[in-house]
Swiss-Prot record:
Residues 1-25 form the signal peptide. It is found in: Cell outer membrane. The lineage of its organism: Bacteria, Pseudomonadati, Pseudomonadota, Gammaproteobacteria, Alteromonadales. This is LPS-assembly protein LptD. GO terms for biological process: Gram-negative-bacterium-type cell outer membrane assembly; lipopolysaccharide transport. Keywords: Cell outer membrane, Membrane, Signal. Together with LptE, is involved in the assembly of lipopolysaccharide (LPS) at the surface of the outer membrane. It comes from the Bacteria. It holds the Pfam family LptD. Component of the lipopolysaccharide transport and assembly complex. Interacts with LptE and LptA. Belongs to the LptD family. One of its GO terms (cellular component) is transporter complex.
Amino acid sequence: MFFSRTLSFTLVALLVVCLSQKAHANVEQKSQSPETRLMQCPLPEFDDIAIGIPEVVDSTIRISSSQASIQQDQIALFNGSVILVDKGQKIIADQLSFNRLKMQIEAIGNIHYQGKQINIFADKLSASKIDKSTEMTAASYQLDGNPGHGKAGKLSINSDGMMSLVDSTFTTCLQEVPDWQIKASEINLSAKGDFGEAYHAQFRVLDVPVFYVPYFSFPISKERLTGFLYPELSTSSSLGIEFTAPFYWNIAENYDATITPRYMSERGTQLQTEFRYLMDQQSGKIDLEYLNKDKKIKTNDDPRYLARFQHIGTFSEDFRAYIDYTTISDDNYLVDIGSKQYNSNDAYLYQIGELAYFGEQWQATLQLQDFEVLGDHQSSYKTLPHLELSAQQPLNFLSGQFELYSEMTNFQPSEKDQVSANRYHVEAGFTFPITRPSWFLNSEVKLMHTYYQQDNISAGSSLEETVDRTLPKVRIHAGVNFDRQLLAFGQSYRHTLEPQLQYLYVPDEDQSNIGLYDTTILQDDFHGIFRDTRYSGLDRIAAANQFTWGITSRLLDEENLEIIRVSLGRIQYLGENNTDLANDALLTDNGGIDNKQSSVAADLFYRINHQWQVSGDIQYNTLEDFTNKGQVNLDYQINKYNLIQLNHRYTRNVSGDSLEQASLLTSIAINENWAFVGRLTQDLQQDRSLESYAGFQYESCCWAVRIAYQRHINSNLDAASFVSEGREQFDTGISIKLIIKGLDGKQSAIGTQEMFDKSIFGYKRPYYLQN
């Protein structure tokens, strides 16, 4: 069923693409660069107004004009194309006078003042060399390298470079009638041009007053400044009306915090805080989300919260530390409240602390790890602690290497009635990797010994208190690379044929007396069939006496860009695989193997042209004629602003049920102002929508707005103590976000990636292991 549906899906996709696009061999034009789709917002540029006049490095003033005269031996008068150059400033005017005794400059007519951070045009200028101040009237100004500009009845610059604008305006809109502007009795701009302050300010839209504030400060540059960030308004059936107003606190150069009150009409008011720190070779952040009382929870008054601590640091060239710890009040917090830390469909929270040493020949890792499992998913074991030691020593023959790996792990269960265990493992052996341009031969022989000490074993269990397991492993993996030049469709290609063969031997041993602590079955895709184990962890080491064959063929163009890749492979068993999996429900391979051979694993990639590409993989059981797993993807991408991704995937027997889903994701830059992002995810087995998301964004050079609609299925992970009233099967909502460019230091809008992130499934860029 899946195989035919997937084949039809692929053929239809290819037909649509081929009808609308030329074949790859006939396409010469490459995709547009991302810049061709960007909105152009050119900033006013001003040339040096004193070209040809040397710069001043001391207190000297240089003046050039058409005419000059001196009055009373103290006032110098200049007329016609006057240019004054002083330290840090330059002035053009029709007329200018300089009083030598008062050290005063007066200028009138077509004044252009050019400072380090600003260009000003005015009718009149007065400057004092004594107190190093400048004052202009009827002025208009333009910040340098910034769209910020405006007008002022009077503009003053003090000795520190701080600008004070009386009866003034500020905007980042370049048109004659700006979409928005601040009109204030006074605006102060810092000397560095990084922030501004407005007093008795009106915020105007199309020159119509919208609201009034007695005072507010705003960043102009990208420097981090304390103040409110943009609020966001949304609605949903679960939260009601939601409003967030983040406040950014620039505590110090290497510390900052964001404090966000989050009002939810159906739940209450939540406080979100994020604290970040950056030190020498150390960085991290602490996130806390706290809701004192959820109005929808009637069973108790307990608070609902999420806390997360992340840290990464190095202590020298050899030592590294890593921490990621999250705790949560209840299993359904992410579903009911939502969080920026995790998606609402996440089933567990990561909790890990790690200290690692990396030497030239020795490596060591000490790790504490746990997973906080949400809902009725299979509980996991804590590793308290997990210690790894590994070493490598080159040999003097056959490019060989001696390798040693050992670990000690203490497994602590989540439930009191579960088995606990200590596991000690060591494996040592020799590897001989030989790699040449046209072939490779990798061989290894190792001896693996594992010791288990298991406690709290229930009566009637097949587990034993102590278990010793010693197994050898032999692995030989070889491959050959053939290539030839191929002329097709009038173009030259390089065609490769890459067969490979692997032999793996591990003797059979009954392991049903060992519990499952960190072991699960791994993917048997094309790359997975060449692994030396079928399982993660060490609780099961599958018996193997098998050959794995595989072949890959590629077509590459003259730029060595991969056009087509086809891979096919399978495991052939020389003897029966008797590793006892009868009681290991988690390790069931869903019919992926029989006593003679595994499922066929295939992988396909086809770059139709520079914009379109198709990829897919499948694991197909030829003996019983069914598909274990498979997926197919169709990707169209001109640049990060224009893309389409169509995906279909199938997995047989996931938790007793098959999974089959199809999804469509698209991002379209309609023009330089409008963009659209949409996503649809459909459960084909249950014939229901899992998620619908549509977002429109309008962006101009000085403001942007995003309006989005989302509807997604709700999980239900309720514990008895947190039963939410009125939880619907689907959560539906609308959100709106407005950005006034230039009032937060950013010159770009929200971006399509942020809209993708709002989707519970997100966007996965095409990734190809062999590309």
